[in-house]
């Protein structure tokens, strides 16, 4: 009997929510949100990040001023232990999710590489 792919996806969602790195990420995010200075800096970082992504997606040039502002925010971020912990934990979780994505995409990869060998 074939498993419903959506059921498997919901199982994966639950597994991610139960993952230790995800739990640590939630705790780290709550710590950032509870500290006004950290929250303001994190919000500033996210706004800047989204603005730069939007510019790139629209084909707009990232100016030297944009780069300078981004560097200044990054320096301040690195000095905030709460945000640093949040970002390190998020990076670990992103590695796990990337690994899972590779596993999920393996059938397509095999299909297309088999087609190229024909």
Curated annotation (Swiss-Prot):
**Cited NCBIfam families:** PRK13676.1-4
Q: What is this protein called?
A: UPF0342 protein BA_0863/GBAA_0863/BAS0820
InterPro entries linked to this entry:
Com_YlbF, YheA/YmcA-like_dom_sf
Specify the domain of life of the species encoding this protein. Answer: Bacteria
Q: Which family is it part of? A: Belongs to the UPF0342 family.
């Amino acid at each position: 009997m074939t498993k419903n792919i959506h059921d498997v996806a919901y199982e994966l969602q639950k597994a991610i929510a139960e993952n230790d790195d995800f739990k640590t990420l939630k705790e780290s995010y709550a710590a950032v949100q509870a500290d006004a200075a950290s929250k303001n800096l994190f919000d500033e970082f996210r706004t800047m990040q989204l603005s730069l992504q939007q510019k790139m997606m629209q084909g707009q040039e990232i100016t030297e001023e944009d780069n300078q502002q981004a560097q200044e925010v990054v320096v301040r971020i690195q000095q905030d232990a709460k945000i640093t912990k949040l970002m390190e934990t998020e990076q670990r979780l992103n590695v796990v999710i990337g690994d899972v994505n590779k596993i999920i995409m393996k059938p397509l990869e095999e299909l297309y590489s088999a087609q190229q060998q024909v």
